[in-house]
């Protein structure tokens, strides 16, 4: 990655501004109430109810928030961060021994694309439940399901254990957050839990090397997360930028020591029938410092049909999306990581009911001519 190949260069309108706007107002939420012995999400007292209001406001107004006193042990986080550094320090040929491809969809990768532009990063992915069941193709008629197994490197020797122990702890946090989000929508706290049986969740270790042209390239181009929830650990270098809902400005999320950055994904947007919105974000790189981050992508089972929840729709607020297969959606997305597409990748707005109505109107007007 010494030279900036044109594959990394963003279109003019998407190139990063090197002057940084620090985000004012991204909520910082203290979860210590969850660990108090006399409180429970199942029977919320006033402190939990206050927390639920905070979470709901953050989801509605930002789609992003940070959490502290979250219950994930610091030593587990430090351990996986150290393992990531050791793994990425190795020569390329060593890392490529666990390279992922279109058949092995987890492992090491260094040529990922976001919106058809190559990202300035290298990654290592592992699934939280192994084997993980996934459709073999995005074709709706193809019912074949494959088992995905993790590929673990020989070095560092403690790598697998550190990854698995960390994932268990963050998974507990993800479930708690989903329960708080359910309450904030007026639902029972366990409303979402069933979707995550046979989950397709994965964890990614990101390494962003120093970039000689940070004004041209991005660590990750602008995108929205396709899953339900993302729980992100970032180091003190920073670089994550969020598109502020109020004015569309790109703002930098300043690292808070030991905090996690949480963002609502597309699935929550659909489940909530647009009450909460998945927000665009991107990652800046810099010319001097490398950066590491570890996102936990909380994904439901492959057989989940994602649609607005019945409890959140009625005659006055009809469903804004038709149901779609999460497994087929994810398989389509995964395939696009390996090649440039001639058309736009699948997005949730392709399933908007209004989009469907517009297409039908268009077809009718053509047929009537």
What are the residue ranges of the model-derived segments?
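Peripheral, non-catalytic segments flanking oxidoreductase cores
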Residues: 1-369
């Amino acid at each position: 990655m010494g030279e900036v190949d044109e594959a990394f260069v963003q279109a003019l309108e998407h190139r990063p501004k090197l002057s940084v706007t620090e985000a004012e107002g991204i909520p910082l939420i203290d979860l210590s109430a969850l660990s108090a012995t006399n409180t429970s999400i199942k029977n919320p007292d006033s402190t939990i109810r206050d927390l639920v209001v905070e979470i709901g406001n953050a989801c509605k107004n930002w789609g992003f928030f940070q959490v502290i006193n979250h219950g994930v042990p610091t030593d587990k986080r430090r351990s996986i961060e150290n393992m990531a550094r050791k793994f990425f320090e190795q020569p390329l040929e060593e890392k490529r021994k666990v390279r992922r491809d279109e058949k092995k969809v987890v492992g090491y990768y260094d040529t990922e694309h976001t919106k058809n532009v190559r990202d300035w990063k290298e990654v290592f992915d592992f699934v939280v439940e192994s084997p993980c069941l996934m459709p073999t193709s995005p074709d709706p008629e193809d019912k074949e399901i494959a088992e995905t197994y993790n590929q673990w490197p020989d070095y560092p020797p403690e790598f697998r254990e550190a990854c698995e122990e960390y994932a268990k702890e963050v998974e507990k946090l993800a479930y708690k957050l989903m329960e708080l989000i359910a309450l904030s929508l007026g639902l029972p706290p366990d409303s979402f839990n069933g979707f995550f049986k046979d989950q397709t969740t994965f964890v990614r270790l990101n390494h962003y090397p120093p970039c000689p042209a940070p004004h041209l390239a991005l660590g990750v181009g602008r995108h929205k997360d396709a899953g339900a929830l993302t729980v992100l650990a970032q180091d003190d270098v920073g670089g994550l930028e969020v598109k502020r809902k109020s004015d569309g400005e790109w703002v930098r999320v300043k690292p808070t020591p030991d905090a996690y950055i949480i963002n609502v994904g597309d699935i929550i947007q659909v489940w909530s029938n647009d009450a909460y919105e998945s927000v665009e974000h991107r990652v800046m790189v810099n010319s001097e410092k490398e950066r590491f981050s570890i996102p936990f992508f909380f994904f439901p089972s492959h057989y989940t049909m994602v649609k607005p929840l019945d409890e959140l729709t009625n005659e006055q607020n009809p469903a804004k999306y038709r149901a779609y297969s999460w497994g087929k959606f994810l398989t389509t997305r995964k395939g696009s990581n390996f090649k440039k597409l001639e058309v736009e990748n699948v997005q949730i707005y392709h399933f908007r009911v209004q989009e469907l109505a517009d297409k039908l109107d268009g077809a009718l007007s053509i047929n009537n001519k």
